[in-house]
Curated annotation (Swiss-Prot):
It catalyses: urea + 2 H2O + H(+) = hydrogencarbonate + 2 NH4(+). This is Urease subunit beta. One of its GO terms (cellular component) is urease complex. It comes from the Bacteria. The keyword Cytoplasm applies.
Amino acid sequence: MIPGEVITPETDIELNVGRETLKVVVANLGDRPIQVGSHFHFYEANDALQFDREAVKGFRLNIAAGTAIRFEPGQSREVEIVALAGKREVYGFAGRVMGKLD
C-alpha cells in the first residue's frame, strides 16, 4: 500500500442507499448562473431558483460529496434530492431554519 492510497471495491459504490429521495423541477428565474453544492440545504437555496420549497425542507441534492449542480439563467431541470440524515438539525446556510427539522 502507498501512503494516501485509497483501495475501493471493483463494483460501483451506491450513494445514500435506503434514504428517502424526491425528484423536483427547478427553474432559474434569475439573470445569472446559480450553483448549489452537494450538502447545501436545498430549501435555503438562492431565491431566484423556483421550486416547491416546503416539499424540499430537510433535503439536499443527491449527488456525490464535494460536487455541485449549476442552473443556468432561464434553465429548468429535474433534480433528485435526498433527505438529510443524522440529528436532522440545520444551522447556517440562509438562516431560515436554525434548529431541528422534525
